[in-house]
């Protein structure tokens, strides 16, 4: 390839970074023939890489889009001249794009080498579009030729061309490749695709399960409706849609006279919405999940089969599908987006913004300093002047002579005055007074604009006009002053000033234009509203708000690219919609469909409507009907809408939220810096201004402030505010915490001590303590020691009392819900009234007791000083007053009765978790303050603009031909259903739209409903049709008005509302963390620790019985799994194949299949029961689930058999709902329908199979666990609102065709709750609001006075519904989202950090070592276990042995007396070291602190478990750490000896030297290493590297010296050929493991040719004794013989498997002293706990000279291994190695070792006699000396050290 020319280089430098057309490295040859020298290719390259070329192409694409948009689709392939012209133009575009593609292919090559044309995704897209375009043209030509030959076929042939032409709409996508910022957004969406795919699977799964359940339960139920008898006319009331009915049962009866219920109706929505077959069932379920129109479906089902239970189906569907699963999308997207943004941020964008701010501040400071300097100059000059004048001088006269001097003088004076004046002006402009004046003027301006309304009096209009001019003048003056005072440059530096200038100039321009008559006043009066933005000037002195605004402006950048993407998306779908549905939305019923695709603007609006999800289903139904209804081609239409809805609504709109959440965090980080400064100042003030307080108090204050300013985690305002809130919750704003109340246990948790010495647990009071009686007297009579008061205190603080009161609160709440709202004096209400007296009495007594105990309110800590107590008092007082006022004014009583609803709130004070959530909500509300302000301002501004645009224009006459109120009189005819035979006479009415813009308040109300996405299309079309004031609408009069609504929706509903939601989420997450702020564990650590404490080992059951084993083998094999999987899938398909009106044969087949599947699944259950035995089978929750399903299925089969039998025998129908000739389809036979569900539930088993979905499910359940208090709060909210609703709106009559009807009303409590649930999902809540406002018809049974039948409902409905909607939509549902995002952060988290999901692996692998789930394994197995688990939890198989040992020293699990470690302790130690939880510093202290933390967070942890996991202080546990520490020391000795040998070439003979050197290794090498291991400092990479190298170097040593403890004689290794023992276990599993492990070279060192310790031996599950005898570990290459013999003797000969023979058993028998009797002797002292700690037992040491000749004994390194293997190693001193009787660490050696350890910093180990002894043994072994020799040498050494030369007495 030729070198690039210099001009190429230059080009390359100049070219800015464009993603696609970068200069690609060009291949030497393109299309196999064109080289780089080829002139054609050279030309192509230069053109393609020419800068303007890209621009030209982009412009062409843009032009093409315009051409596509102008095209007018017509029905039936009609055309007009414009369309024909555009088709010609299409050829031009096609040619341009073809040329572009061809040139790029020539320049870059086509496909085969890197960077070829088709290697880029965008180019592939281009190529496909161009190719299809060319293909279409060819087809068209073919069609034309065909048409000429055979004119008949033209219609058919044209179709495929039309379909292909639709691909043109993808061209706008090419714009993406031209805009880099778009690609960030797209990238983050693409990155999120994988987790989104999992979620999509989960959603699909939900939809399938619910669709099949729907199919089973509601199949064919929707086809009956009310017809007039003998006709096909559907009987409906006015405004009512036809809906299903039921002849019998509890469905809807036909009430209209002369109507009957019969079948043959296609069904609701022209037969699209039903559950008759799987496809439509899925569509209906999906529509419900999208929360649009789900209530309609529910009400239809209710009408068809009764309302007892269908709500369960729909409500669970909404809760699971909409609230949970679909919010996962948000979790994933925001995670991905934040990551993408992090990358961008690391490039420093945000830093720049900060620096810029800093620079501006500096510059301002500098400018003001300079100007001040100038002024001072002036002052000095002035003073100088005067002195000159006073002195007087002749020279002045000389100046006077010259004429110039006066002018010069004047100019100089003028300059000085100008400077002074400008400085003064600058001061004035900068002063607070000026600022507040401006704010006042802005407020007046706002007032004058807001006072405009429809039909306002003339004087007001005049006043507004004058005010407008005056204010404009004032603003102009302000602007000029600023310009003069600050100088132009500094003035225009501020964005606000630029904006101000723009507003003022536009105002002046407006007045000039209106005065000169060049413009109508309206058009520009909208500009007047922009002045309202001036309100944002407040932000100048309000830092958090100004930062929020800055952050919003900042995120507008990221949102701009998203908007562009959204816009492209909308354009593409609008163009596609025009191709598909243009001109097709005209139906027979002559009703105009407003949301159609007949032209481009209209298509845009329709697509936007589907995107916001409002009524998208009705647009889809129209689309299906346009293609011939719910039959073959029509149904495919739904694909278009579903893709549009999913991509738009779920993905793009959630990215909005992701961006919002992201930018908020940034706004906070700006604020926090300023906050910190303020805190600093405050702290200084505080510490200065506390002279009267004691030192201690002052310290607490400053400490509090410090804590505040620190605020761990993301420093956000939310965080800081939360701190303030927490510290002020129970305080009267004083800096020290107030006394607590019994329920108020915020502060009574133990503080974790900060002192260096840990406090023992006893001092950390973990019990919730009662609040003491305050010092002051209560009611001035009861002193603190008064008997009565003490008794009251005891009662109030008793737990039974609290529970008793809670019970009464619950009962009284239930009584409220049970009231009958319609018949006020019914029997039920009278009984409840008596109950009410009882409740009130109890609550009054409670309050009196509490007041007696704590005093009323005069002193600190008294009853009324706590907000929650005041709430209690208020509730009780209301009850008492309402009882007293029974007779007086009704309205007051009514209000008071409604206030009783607050009773359940008293539970908050009693339940701690609930209280926390409520505080969370309060904090959230306070934090959201700023956002609410900004949103309200924007809303207000839009409302003002709306008033200008639409006031008085939303009137209409119901007879559309009349345009004004005068004309709209008399009667007019109407044809029912467009049928000319049915004529009806109706009176004309002049109607005002319910939502309108006649004044600012109603405008804000209308806009609020728009921002909730409910009913906005109707309002939009009203606005589009609006004409003049007080006249009727004109169809499509002002389409441009849609811009107002779309901008509003994007700005407020997409952006601000999402920021709102984002803020709530961020706040809740912060709040969740604050709860644990003092416990020093972050969320992940908490989760892992909790898992480690709660986890239990799995049973890995292998049956012993050979037949049972065969079954077990089959059941646990993977093939069996796959078979069941396939069967479940088949079952699903069979269930999905059922449909309504299926043939008899089909019915028969499905019945047979059902029986077959039931038999198969029963068989599976039986097999598993045989294999696992009942105990093992029911241990797994999935099996329990299986079992229930099988039982249910069997019942279902039996029932259906009985059914068919009864049906065939023609007998009575006796199932569900009594006997009688009942149509089986009619009655909602919950009995058999319920059992049918079991068929469907088998599907749920599939969830257990897919890994990703399983994790999703697991987290799902986790988030449910996190929700109890949130759920409780939601329940409370619903309860309170439902009861209020019953009291206020219960009397409204139910009228079909209105929103308060048979399915939707407030007459019973369950109905009220369902209605509220509907409002929470946003289903037409604004219409329910209108239906509950004043002036509605009353229920005939209610107690209204005559003539008052239209007085029900109340305008309180506005407050009621708006407050409920806001609470629900912005707080409650976001609680769901916050919890989910919290739990799902793992989807996008960093997998290298240990998290709870890693811990399952540990459980699974542990089970192989501990199949019986005893919870213990041999400590020697721990290393193998951990090497099998991958990091971050385990060590991984490539971890060198020494590093593994060092990590074990750091983990330091407690070791049981039988040499085992426990499950929880091991897991806990792993978690602790992996996450570095309290591993630094003094280990014992850290342990104690950690114990306290665990007790604080997990109060129910049993002390036994806690001691097992973290041994308490003073418990001289033997731990794995100490064991491996001796091992490491020994290794160092060995290395040291090796070095010695290499150095001297032989062994140095002098004992003392050797020992000294050995001790030095302890001190200098081993100790620091162990120290590091203990403090967990092992992560250093180089450490690992070094260890790996060392391991490799020492391979020789390892091999020679065998395994863990010292050298093993080679002859033993040769002869030790034990046969591997396999006791009927499954070879398959373990063989795999063994191969895997042996791949690692490091591993091989640990497996000498010794089959007995082969990994297979581990599987020795059934011979427990063999396990014990052999220690069964892959690390025991030298099964430490002495210890084994010893152990075997303990076990007794009988326990030994007899079959074992071989050299191993010989030495044991040979060794004389170790005969049975000897062991018995040794056993005796073991049973008593003997000597004081640390004292060496004399007996074994005195028996010197026992037979030590036996080679085995000499080599057996007893101590180190033994002190782990002997039972009861706590008093290890009692059984020192007795196998070699003289092997004792004698006093002198021990002293030296202790000294060395202390010097090495291992004091705790030095104090441990066991450890010292083991080390002494290791020292002797390494030096190859007898202990006596070591002792002699040691004594010599001590003599040299001590001055007297005598041996120092040894006291450990």
From Swiss-Prot:
I repeats: 38-337
Membrane topology, Extracellular segments: 71-85, 137-160, 219-279, 302-309, 452-462, 515-523, 582-601, 624-633, 819-830, 886-892, 951-1000, 1022-1038, 1141-1148, 1201-1231, 1290-1311, 1331-1356
Compositional bias (Basic and acidic residues): 690-711, 1747-1757
Residues covered by region (Interaction with calmodulin): 1522-1542
Family annotation (InterPro entries): CAC1F_C, GPHH_dom, Ion_trans_dom, VDCC_a1su_IQ, VDCC_alpha-1_subunit, VDCC_L_a1ssu, VDCC_L_a1su, VDCCAlpha1
Residue ranges annotated as motif Selectivity filter of repeat II: 612-615
Presence of keyword Cytoplasm: no
Segments dipping into the membrane without crossing: 280-301, 602-623, 1001-1021, 1312-1330
III repeat intervals: 768-1068
Ranges of the Cytoplasmic topological domain: 1-51, 107-115, 180-196, 331-432, 484-494, 543-561, 654-799, 851-866, 912-930, 1061-1118, 1171-1180, 1251-1268, 1382-1852
An annotated GO BP: endoplasmic reticulum organization
Binding-site positions, Ca(2+): 292, 614, 1014
Residues with PTM Phosphoserine: 393, 397, 687, 1575, 1617
Sequence segments annotated as region (Phenylalkylamine binding): 1349-1391, 1349-1392
Region (Dihydropyridine binding): 988-1077, 1337-1403
Disease with which this protein is associated in UniProt: Defects in Cacna1s are the cause of muscular dysgenesis (MDG), a lethal autosomal recessive disorder in which there is total lack of excitation-contraction coupling in homozygotes, and which results in complete skeletal muscle paralysis. A single nucleotide deletion yields a protein with an altered and truncated C-terminus.
Free-text note on domains in this protein's UniProt record: Each of the four internal repeats contains five hydrophobic transmembrane segments (S1, S2, S3, S5, S6) and one positively charged transmembrane segment (S4). S4 segments probably represent the voltage-sensor and are characterized by a series of positively charged amino acids at every third position.
Biological role: Pore-forming, alpha-1S subunit of the voltage-gated calcium channel that gives rise to L-type calcium currents in skeletal muscle. Calcium channels containing the alpha-1S subunit play an important role in excitation-contraction coupling in skeletal muscle via their interaction with RYR1, which triggers Ca(2+) release from the sarcplasmic reticulum and ultimately results in muscle contraction. Long-lasting (L-type) calcium channels belong to the 'high-voltage activated' (HVA) group.
Protein name: Voltage-dependent L-type calcium channel subunit alpha-1S
Source organism of this protein record: Mus musculus
């Amino acid at each position: 390839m030729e070198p690039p020319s210099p001009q190429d280089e230059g080009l390359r430098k100049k070219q800015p970074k464009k993603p696609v057309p970068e200069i690609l490295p060009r291949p030497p040859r393109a299309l196999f023939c064109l080289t780089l020298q080829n002139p054609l290719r050279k030309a192509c390259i230069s053109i393609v890489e020419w800068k303007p070329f890209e621009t030209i192409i982009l412009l062409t694409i843009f032009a093409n889009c315009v051409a596509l948009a102008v095209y007018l689709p017509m029905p039936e392939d009609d055309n007009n001249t414009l369309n024909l012209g555009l088709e010609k133009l299409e050829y031009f575009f096609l040619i341009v794009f073809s040329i572009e593609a061809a040139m790029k292919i020539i320049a870059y090559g086509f496909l085969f080498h890197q960077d070829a044309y088709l290697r880029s995704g965008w180019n592939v897209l281009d190529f496909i579009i161009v190719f299809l375009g060319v293909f279409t043209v060819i087809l068209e030509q073919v069609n034309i030729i065909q048409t000429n030959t055979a004119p008949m076929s033209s219609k058919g042939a044209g179709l495929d061309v039309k379909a292909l032409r639709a691909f043109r709409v993808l061209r706008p996508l090419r714009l993406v490749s031209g805009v880099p910022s778009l690609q960030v957004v797209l990238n983050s969406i693409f990155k999120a695709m994988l987790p989104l795919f999992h979620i999509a699977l989960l959603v699909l799964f939900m939809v399938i399960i619910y669709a099949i359940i729907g199919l089973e339960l509601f199949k064919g139920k929707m086809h009956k409706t009310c017809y007039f008898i003998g006709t096909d006319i559907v009987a409906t009331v006015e405004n009512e849609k036809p809906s299903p009915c039921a002849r019998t049962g509890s469905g809807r009866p036909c009430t209209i006279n002369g109507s009957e219920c019969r079948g043959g109706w296609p069904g609701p929505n022209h037969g699209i919405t039903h559950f008759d077959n799987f496809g439509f069932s899925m569509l209906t379920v999906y529509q419900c999940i999208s929360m649009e129109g789900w209530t309609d479906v529910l009400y239809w089902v209710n009408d068809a089969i009764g309302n007892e239970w269908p709500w369960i189906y729909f409500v669970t569907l909404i809760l699971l599908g909409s609230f949970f699963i679909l919010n996962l999308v948000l979790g994933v997207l925001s995670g991905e987006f934040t990551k993408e943004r992090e990358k961008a941020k690391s490039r420093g964008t945000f830093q720049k913004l900060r620096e810029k701010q800093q620079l501006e501040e500096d510059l301002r400071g500098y400018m003001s300093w300079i100007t001040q300097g100038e002024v001072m100059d002036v002052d000095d000059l002035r003073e100088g002047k005067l002195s000159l004048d006073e002195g007087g001088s002749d020279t002045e006269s000389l100046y006077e002579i010259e004429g110039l001097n006066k002018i010069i003088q004047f100019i100089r004076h003028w300059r000085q005055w100008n400077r002074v004046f400008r400085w003064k002006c600058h001061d004035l402009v900068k002063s607070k007074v000026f600022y507040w004046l401006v704010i006042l003027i802005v407020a007046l301006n706002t007032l004058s604009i807001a006072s405009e309304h429809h039909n306002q009096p003339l004087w007001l209009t005049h006043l507004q006009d004058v005010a407008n001019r005056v204010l404009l003048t004032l603003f102009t003056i302000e602007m000029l002053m600023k310009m003069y005072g600050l100088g132009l440059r500094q003035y225009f530096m501020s964005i606000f000033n630029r904006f101000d200038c723009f507003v003022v100039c536009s105002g002046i321009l407006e007045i000039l234009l209106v005065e000169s008559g060049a413009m109508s006043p309206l058009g520009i009066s909208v500009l007047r509203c922009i002045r309202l933005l001036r309100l944002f000037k407040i932000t100048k002195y309000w830092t958090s708000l100004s930062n929020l605004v800055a952050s919003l402006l900042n995120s507008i950048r990221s949102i701009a690219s998203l908007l562009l993407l959204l816009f492209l998306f909308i354009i593409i779908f609008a163009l596609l919609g025009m191709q598909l549905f243009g001109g097709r939305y005209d139906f027979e019923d002559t009703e105009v469909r407003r949301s159609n695709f007949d032209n481009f603007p209209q298509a845009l609006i329709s697509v936007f409507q589907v995107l916001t999800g409002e009524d998208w289903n009705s647009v889809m139904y129209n689309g299906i009907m346009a293609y011939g209804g719910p039959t073959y081609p029509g149904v495919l239409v739904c694909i278009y809408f579903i893709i549009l809805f999913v991509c738009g609504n779920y993905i793009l709109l959630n990215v909005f939220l992701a961006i919002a959440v992201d930018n908020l965090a940034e706004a906070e980080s700006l604020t926090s810096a300023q906050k910190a400064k303020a805190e600093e100042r405050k702290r200084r003030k505080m510490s200065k201004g506390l002279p009267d307080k004691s030192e201690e108090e002052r310290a607490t204050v400053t400490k509090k402030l410090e804590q505040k300013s620190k605020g761990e985690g993301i420093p956000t305002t939310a965080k800081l505010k939360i701190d303030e809130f927490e510290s002020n919750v129970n305080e009267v704003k004083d800096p020290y915490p107030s006394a607590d109340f019994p329920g108020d246990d915020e502060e009574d948790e133990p503080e974790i001590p900060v002192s260096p010495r840990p406090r023992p647990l006893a001092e950390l009071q973990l019990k919730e303590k009662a609040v003491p009686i305050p010092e002051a007297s209560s009611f001035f009579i009861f002193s603190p020691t008064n008997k009565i008061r003490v008794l009251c205190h005891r009662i109030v603080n008793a737990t039974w009392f609290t529970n008793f009161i809670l019970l009464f609160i619950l009962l009284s709440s239930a009584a409220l819900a049970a009231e009958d709202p319609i018949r006020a004096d019914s029997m039920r209400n009278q009984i409840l009234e008596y109950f009410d007296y009882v409740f009130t009495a109890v609550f009054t007594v409670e309050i009196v007791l509490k007041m007696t105990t704590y005093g009323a309110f005069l002193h600190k800590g008294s009853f009324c000083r706590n907000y929650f107590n005041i709430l209690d008092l208020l509730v009780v007082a209301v009850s008492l007053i309402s009882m007293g006022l029974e007779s007086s004014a009704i309205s007051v009583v009514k209000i008071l009765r409604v206030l009783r609803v607050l009773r359940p709130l008293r539970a908050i004070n009693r339940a701690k978790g609930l209280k926390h959530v409520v505080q969370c909500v309060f904090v959230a509300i306070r934090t959201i303050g700023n956002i609410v302000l900004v949103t309200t301002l924007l809303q207000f501004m839009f409302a003002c603009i709306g008033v200008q645009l639409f006031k008085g224009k939303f009137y209409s006459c119901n007879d559309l031909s009349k345009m004004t109120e005068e004309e709209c009189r008399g009667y007019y005819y109407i044809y029912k259903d467009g049928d000319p035979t049915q004529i009806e006479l109706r009176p004309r009415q002049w109607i005002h739209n319910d939502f309108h813009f006649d004044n600012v308040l109603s405008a804000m109300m209308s806009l609020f409903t728009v921002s909730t996405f409910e009913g906005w299309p109707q309002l939009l079309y009203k606005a589009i049709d609006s004409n003049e004031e007080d006249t009727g609408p004109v169809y499509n009069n002002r389409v441009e008005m849609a811009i107002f609504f779309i901008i509003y929706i994007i700005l407020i509903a997409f952006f601000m509302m999402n920021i709102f939601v984002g803020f709530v989420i961020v706040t809740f997450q912060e709040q969740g963390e604050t709860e644990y702020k003092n416990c020093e564990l972050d969320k992940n650590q908490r989760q892992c620790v909790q898992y480690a404490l709660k986890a239990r080992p799995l049973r890995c059951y292998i049956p012993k019985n050979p037949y049972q084993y065969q079954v077990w083998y089959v059941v646990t094999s993977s093939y069996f799994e796959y078979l069941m999987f396939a069967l479940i899938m088949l079952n699903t398909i069979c269930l999905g194949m059922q449909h309504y009106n299926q043939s008899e044969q089909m019915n028969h087949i499905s019945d047979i299949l059902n029986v077959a599947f039931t038999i198969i699944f029963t068989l599976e259950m039986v097999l598993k029961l045989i294999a696992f035995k009942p105990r093992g089978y029911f241990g797994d929750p999935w099996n329990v689930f299986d079992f229930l399903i099988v039982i249910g299925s069997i019942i279902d089969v039996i029932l259906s058999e009985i059914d068919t039998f009864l049906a065939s025998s023609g007998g009575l129908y006796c199932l569900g709902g009594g006997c009688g000739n009942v149509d089986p389809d009619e009655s909602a036979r919950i009995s058999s329908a319920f059992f049918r569900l079991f068929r469907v539930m088998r599907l749920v088993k599939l969830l257990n199979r897919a890994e990703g979905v399983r994790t999703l499910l697991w987290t799902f359940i986790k988030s449910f666990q996190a929700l109890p208090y949130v759920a409780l709060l939601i329940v409370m909210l619903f309860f309170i609102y439902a009861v209020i609703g019953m009291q206020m709106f219960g009397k409204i009559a139910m009228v079909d065709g209105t929103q308060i009807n048979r399915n939707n009303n407030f007459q019973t409590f369950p109905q009220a709750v369902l209605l509220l649930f509907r409002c929470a999902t946003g289903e037409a809540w604004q219409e329910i609001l209108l239906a509950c406002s004043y002036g509605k018809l009353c229920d005939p049974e209610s107690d209204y006075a005559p003539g008052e039948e239209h007085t029900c409902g109340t305008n309180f409905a506005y407050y009621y519904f708006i407050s409920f909607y806001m609470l629900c939509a912005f707080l409650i549902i976001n609680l769901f989202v916050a919890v989910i995002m919290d739990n799902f952060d793992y989807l996008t988290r960093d997998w290298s950090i240990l998290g709870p999901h890693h811990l399952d692996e540990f459980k699974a692998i542990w089970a192989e070592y501990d199949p019986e789930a005893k919870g213990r394994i041999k400590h020697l197995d721990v290393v193998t276990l951990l090497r099998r688990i991958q990091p971050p939890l385990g060590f991984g198989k490539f971890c060198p042995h020494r590093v593994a040992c060092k990590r074990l020293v750091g983990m330091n699990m407690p070791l049981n007396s039988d040499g085992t470690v426990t499950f929880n302790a091991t897991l806990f130690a792993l978690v602790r070291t992996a996450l570095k939880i309290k591993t630094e510093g003094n280990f014992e202290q850290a342990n104690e602190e950690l114990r306290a933390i665990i007790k604080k967070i997990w109060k129910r942890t049993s002390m036994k478990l806690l001691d097992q996991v973290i041994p308490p202080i003073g418990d001289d546990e033997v731990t794995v750490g100490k064991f491996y520490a001796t091992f490491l020391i020994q290794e160092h000795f060995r290395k040291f000896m090796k070095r010695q040998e290499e150095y001297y070439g032989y062994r140095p003979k002098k004992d003392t030297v050797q020992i000294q050197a050995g001790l030095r290794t302890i001190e200098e090498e081993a100790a620091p290493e162990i120290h590091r291991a203990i403090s967990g400092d092992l992560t250093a990479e180089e450490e690992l590297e070094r260890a790996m190298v060392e391991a490799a170097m020492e391979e020789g040593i390892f091999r020679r010296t065998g395994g863990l403890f010292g050298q093993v004689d080679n002859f033993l290794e040769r002869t030790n050929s034990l046969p591997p023992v396999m006791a009927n276990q499954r070879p398959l599993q373990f063989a795999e493991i063994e191969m895997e492990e042996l791949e690692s070279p490091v591993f091989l060192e640990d497996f000498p040719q010794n089959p007995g310790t082969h990994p297979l031996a581990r599987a020795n599950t059934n011979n427990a004794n063999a396990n014990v005898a052999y220690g069964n570990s892959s690390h025991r290459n030298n099964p430490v013989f002495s210890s084994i013999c010893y152990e075997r003797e303990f076990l007794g000969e009988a326990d030994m498997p007899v079959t074992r023979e071989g050299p191993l058993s010989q030495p044991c028998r040979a060794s004389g002293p170790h005969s049975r009797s000897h062991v018995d002797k040794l056993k005796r002292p073991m049973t008593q706990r003997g000597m004081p700690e640390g004292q060496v037992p004399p007996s074994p040491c005195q028996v010197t000279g026992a037979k030590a000749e036996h080679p085995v004994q000499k080599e057996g390194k007893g101590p180190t291994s033994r002190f782990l293997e002997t039972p009861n190693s706590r008093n290890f001193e009692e059984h020192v190695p007795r196998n070699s009787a003289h092997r004792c660490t004698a006093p002198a050696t021990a002293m030296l070792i202790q000294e060395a350890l202390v010097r090495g910093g291992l004091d705790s180990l030095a104090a441990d006699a066991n450890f010292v002894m083991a080390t002494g043994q290791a020292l002797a072994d390494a030096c190859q000396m007898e202990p006596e020799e070591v002792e002699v040498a040691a004594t010599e050494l001590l003599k040299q050290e001590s001055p007297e030369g005598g041996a120092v007495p040894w006291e450990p």
